[in-house]
Design a protein with these regions (language model features):
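Secondary-structure transition/capping motifs at alpha-helix termini
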Residues: 2-3, 79-81, 130-133
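A generic structural signal for alpha->beta connector loops
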Residues: 4-6, 84, 107, 134
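Long, compositionally biased stretches enriched for glycine and/or charged residues
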Residues: 129-258
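Rossmann-fold dinucleotide-binding core
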Residues: 90-154
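Conserved N-terminal Rossmann-fold NAD(P) cofactor-binding segment
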Residues: 1-19, 26, 31-35
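Rossmann-fold NAD(P)-binding glycine/threonine-rich loop
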Residues: 29-105
C-alpha cells in the first residue's frame, strides 16, 4: 500500500485520539484478575458452568456492567476530539456494548466487530482441504450468531461448487464419533480442530447452516449443550468448561515471556 505508518504510545487517551480517522477498542475492564476469575468462581459455586462468559449469562452481564461505563467515557472523548472518526469496536459483550454506545451517542459512527467470520471461513476451508483464497461465502446474522448462507468453491469455467454437502459428511461422522472416512476424498483428516467443533457441526446437522461463533461460545448461547445433571453432553460434544480461564493463563504466560 506504500504506507509508512508511525506507531506512538500515549498515557493520555484524549491525546491519542487527536486527528484520528479511525478508533479501535480492544480492552478488558477489570483484567483477568480479579474480575474475570470472579465471573467464573461465583457462578461455579451455584452449579453454573461457563466456557467463555463474556457475552451473556452471569459472566457477560457482569462484564457489561464493568465495561459500558468505560466505553461511554471513550465515546465522550471521541465526540469531543475526533467526532468524524469511525469507531471499530471489538469489546465484549458486543451487543450490550453497542446498544449502550448507540443509545448514548447516536452521532458516532461505530460498528461492532469480531474475527469469527473470517476465522471460521479459514477453519472450514482447512477442514475441507481447500485454500481459503478459493472460497466464496455469504454470511448473515448478528455478531457472535451469524451463519454462512453460502459456502462455495470458486470455479473459473462454470458455477461454483456448493461445499455444504461435503461439510455435512464431516458433521455426520464427527458428531456420531465415527472415524473420518474416505467418503469425501477432500476431507482434511489432519485438521487439528475438527474433532473439537462438535457443537457447531451438530448445529449444521440440525439447521443446515454453519454458525460463525466457536463451539465453546455457541454451547453457552443456547440451552441444549450445557445442562444441569447432563455431564454426558459436555463429554460427548467436547465442551471446554472454564476455557476462558485457561486462555487467560496461557496468554499471561506469553506476555510475561515477552
Amino acid at each position: 500500500l506504500d504506507a509508512s505508518p508511525k506507531i506512538t504510545s500515549h498515557t493520555d487517551r484524549r491525546e491519542s485520539l487527536v486527528g484520528s480517522d479511525f478508533v479501535q477498542t480492544t480492552i478488558q475492564v477489570g483484567g483477568y484478575k480479579p474480575s474475570t476469575i470472579i465471573d467464573f468462581e461465583i457462578p461455579r459455586q451455584y452449579g453454573l458452568k461457563q466456557t467463555i462468559a463474556d457475552t451473556l449469562g452471569i459472566g457477560g452481564i457482569m462484564r457489561g456492567l464493568r465495561t459500558i461505563p468505560v466505553l461511554l467515557d471513550i465515546a465522550k472523548d471521541i465526540m469531543e476530539v475526533c467526532p468524524k472518526a469511525l469507531w471499530l469496536q471489538y469489546v465484549n459483550p458486543m451487543c450490550a456494548n453497542m446498544i449502550a454506545i448507540n443509545n448514548s451517542f447516536p452521532e458516532i459512527k461505530t460498528v461492532g466487530l469480531c474475527h469469527s467470520v473470517q476465522g471460521t471461513a479459514e477453519m472450514l476451508a482447512k477442514d475441507l482441504g481447500e485454500k481459503i483464497e478459493d472460497i466464496e461465502y455469504l454470511c448473515v446474522g448478528i455478531n457472535h450468531m451469524a451463519f454462512y448462507k453460502k459456502f462455495e468453491k470458486k470455479s473459473n469455467d462454470g458455477p461454483n461448487e456448493d461445499l455444504y454437502p461435503r461439510l455435512k459428511i464431516i458433521a455426520d461422522e464427527i458428531v456420531n464419533d465415527e472415524k473420518l472416512s474416505s467418503r469425501s476424498e477432500k476431507i482434511n483428516h489432519e485438521s487439528d480442530k475438527i474433532l473439537h467443533e462438535k457443537v457447531r457441526y451438530e448445529i449444521l446437522r440440525r439447521f443446515g447452516y454453519f454458525v460463525t461463533e466457536s463451539s465453546e461460545h455457541f454451547a453457552e448461547y443456547v440451552p441444549w449443550f450445557i445442562k444441569p445433571n447432563k455431564e454426558e453432553l459436555i463429554e460427548k460434544y467436547k465442551i471446554p468448561v472454564d476455557e476462558y480461564i485457561f486462555r487467560c493463563e496461557y496468554y499471561s504466560e506469553l506476555w510475561n515471556e515477552l
